[in-house]
Amino acid sequence: MPIVTLPDGSQKTFDSPITVMQLAESIGTGLAKACVAGKIDGVPVDTADVIEHDAEVSILTPRDQEGLEIIRHSCAHLVGHAVKQLYPDAKMAIGPVIDDGFYYDIDFGQSVSPEDLEAIEKRMKVLIDHEYEVIREYVTKEQALATFIDRDEPYKQEIVEGIADGETVRLYHHEEYIDMCRGPHVPNTRHLKAFKLTKLAGAYWRGDANKPMLTRIYGTAWADKKALKTYLKRLEEAEKRDHRKLARKLDFFHMQEEAPGMVFWHPRGWTLWQTVEQYMRGVYKDSGYQEIRCPQIMDVSLWQKSGHWDNYAENMFFTESEKREYALKPMNCPGHVQVFNSGLRSYRELPVRYGEFGGCHRNEPSGALHGIMRVRAFTQDDGHVFCTEEQIEPEVTAFHRQALAVYRDFGFDDIAVKIALRPEKRLGSDDNWDRAEEALRNALSRCDVEWEELPGEGAFYGPKIEYHMRDCLGREWQVGTMQVDFMMPTRLGAQYVAEDGSRQAPVMLHRAIVGSMERFIGILIEHYAGSMPLWLSPLQAVVLNITDAQREYAESVTQRLQKSGLRVKTDLRNEKIGFKIREHTLQKIPYLLVVGDKEVEAGAVAVRTRSGEDLGSLSVDALIARLQEEGV
């Protein structure tokens, strides 16, 4: 006689074990119709799972985030069903859930076109209309292996072979199609109607460039057609804001095959970069950081001592010279320790804070590269604090407040704070990790801020606070970090003279606010759709003459504005004024300053904004005052 406790605290008693679906039916037909899965004592389960003992049970529907993820996972299986009907020789790999959707990696043995994607989506809709039951089956490892050998699915075979002997495997049957998964999955395809396949991409099997290149089919799925439509509209807007397209249009940067994952900055883009860098340089100064510069290439022995060799070598670039092996730095921290070690420090000097706009190189897989959001060569606003254990909390607290102020200045107010906790592969003792994680929690508590904890997501040398910005489209971007590290100073021999005269290893705090400068600028471009705030705009105004008669005056206005510290140029081309206005509006220049005979006579300019607003005639002095005030 199981007693079931529901989320609202109410209880239901049954004479015999019941399934999750039967429980839903006992509550109401509407709930049963919407039920996609359940949770028994917090564990997600299929609707066919049996409640055999007293338990806390909740019914999952498409309105629940977990229910929505189950729908997305089931849609990935539906992709497999449709693909195998249309392309029987295709080999299925993996199909996980991702943010806002899912994907399936498939070896088609041929190129796949957008027309193929449309055909697969069309077949999925036909299968959904069948409203067939999704059947779960428990089998042994040997039975699962036999199933996929019989179906000539080598990638599935490889996955099964990696499962521990004696472990039970779940198979899910979509009519004649069989897939494997931990589940749970929807009980019927009628729950999958609000979906859309979005794009094709390439991906190496297991992320290994030495293994076959597969076709990745991306898709999204939602609770209903209205939510799907809203998301697709957001996706369309994101496409318009794609920083790669805007960069070409606005002449910010380009990338090319000869330097994959590396950026060719153009004058306007580099001006934007320098504006961000100079702002962050001011943050260094205001926060008591001394700016330093370290080598790009260092002997591998340093990386072996730091722990990067054992934990990060696959992501590093190497080179040789005169029979010595060197590595391009993937991180700045070991170099900063060398600067700290260059002299004997006293406890009275701590905390010592170093900052560097440090260029790093990481050997990211080619399939993971994405414009300037994911690159192989990048620069960080990196900083490291060498301090005592007692100084951790005040340093982290000060950093937290500084980071939030920076994000506000760049136009981001919606910031989620998360603590990434110890990963399975890590350096140091559990005691060190306990103290480091608790120090971060205590610092955030002092700031009266809520946070989410991410088990297993910390770096190999320490836990970290992550700052996630939400942009105008509701997308979340992880930018800043603050990391506690007890290990690296010891490994690299960092010491200070303590108050009692003993030699002690300092604690090292790794911090960055914007993180990768390239990525942060990409986020800014997309957040503002290229229409940067005045202070960030590479070109803040353009002076446009109507005829050659105003050439000299236009040049004098430009010179006055430039001497005032504004980024301005003159457009003296023999083109119609309407053409010039339109061209610079499309270039998203904040202010267009038109000068004709009337403006020359009055010593003024006619001011228009990129949004089309006519601000009328302003004297040059009044204009300078306005722009300087807005650009602060």
From Swiss-Prot:
Q: Where is this region: Catalytic?
A: 242-533
UniProt xrefs under SUPFAM superfamilies: Class II aaRS ABD-related (SSF52954), Class II aaRS and biotin synthetases (SSF55681), TGS-like (SSF81271), ThrRS/AlaRS common domain (SSF55186)
Cofactor, how bound (note): Binds 1 zinc ion per subunit.
**Keyword check for Cell cycle:** no
- What broad class describes the main subcellular location of this protein? cytoplasm
Ranges annotated as spanning the membrane: none
Q: Which SMART domains match?
A: tRNA_SAD
Keywords, A to Z, come to: Aminoacyl-tRNA synthetase, ATP-binding, Cytoplasm, Ligase, Metal-binding, Nucleotide-binding, Protein biosynthesis, RNA-binding, tRNA-binding, Zinc
May I ask which residue range the UniProt record assigns to the signal sequence? none
- EC code: 6.1.1.3
The UniProt GO MF terms for this protein read: ATP binding; metal ion binding; threonine-tRNA ligase activity; tRNA binding
Subcellular location per the Swiss-Prot or TrEMBL entry: Cytoplasm
Question: What cofactors does the UniProt entry give for this protein?
Answer: Zn(2+)
Q: Which residues bind Zn(2+)?
A: C333, H384, H510
PANTHER family in the record: THREONINE--TRNA LIGASE, CHLOROPLASTIC_MITOCHONDRIAL 2, THREONINE-TRNA LIGASE
Q: NCBIfam families, alphabetically? A: thrS
| Family the entry assigns | Belongs to the class-II aminoacyl-tRNA synthetase family.
Subunit structure, per the record? Homodimer.
The name of this protein is: Threonine--tRNA ligase
Q: Which organism is it from?
A: Chromohalobacter salexigens (strain ATCC BAA-138 / DSM 3043 / CIP 106854 / NCIMB 13768 / 1H11)
Q: What is the lineage of its organism?
A: Bacteria, Pseudomonadati, Pseudomonadota, Gammaproteobacteria, Oceanospirillales
- Which gene underlies this protein? thrS
